Amino acid sequence: LNAPVVYTFKGKMEVQYENPYEVGMTGLLGMPSGYYSMHEAEVLLMLGTDFPYSAFLPDDIKIAQIDIKPERLGRRAKVDIGLCGDVKLSIQSLLRMLNPKTDDSFLLKQLKRYEGVKKDLAAYTEDKGDVNKIHPEYVMSEIDKLSSDDAVFTVDTGMTCVWGARYLQATGKRHMLGSFNHGSMAVSYTHLRAHETGAYLV
């Protein structure tokens, strides 16, 4: 498709890693590149997502949705095409009928926008702050660097979610747990205890 790939906070660790099409997150914690990629598109393809914040979804373009749970189809947005099925198997079947798109101008436009967003975010980590006033963006970027490639992060609702969304990077092995749908408070410790399996927990 040569299309930008946008993900939710919940899907960050699974979708972001080594993905040349990714242009950042959508939602309240998302990036302009993610938002505009969806709203400036001709068609939005939603894969296995029950993203609950419909205010961030476009309402004036065609939307196709694939989900293994039929009750999710059209629940968050007006869907023009809804397919019930396993996302991986559905995509594999549909690829055989797809004509490859060679025009990548829209993708390149959003990737350029995303590079600007990442540059702006990185600027916050360059200033460590002062004694007893360490900047949280710097702290989170250091946590990202020091954590193992297979770390499991738990984030509480609030600013830790913001910093985690922006500065913890996917490696293909990392996971992140949080109250992504309901925004429940003070859940990170219980998530951590529930995940005590010998993994590197942060």
Name what the model sees in each region.
Residues 1-68, 171-189:
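Glycine-rich, anion-gripping cofactor-binding loops and their flanking helix/strand elements
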Residues 60-157:
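Phosphate/pyrophosphate-binding active-site segments
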Residues 1-20, 112-184:
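Cofactor-pocket helix-loop regions in the catalytic cores of large enzyme subunits
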Residues 32, 36-39, 89-92, 137-141, ...:
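Short, contiguous clusters of charged residues that form electrostatic/catalytic patches at enzyme active sites
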Residues 53-55, 73, 92, 163:
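Glycine/Thr-rich phosphate-binding loops of Rossmann-like dinucleotide-binding domains
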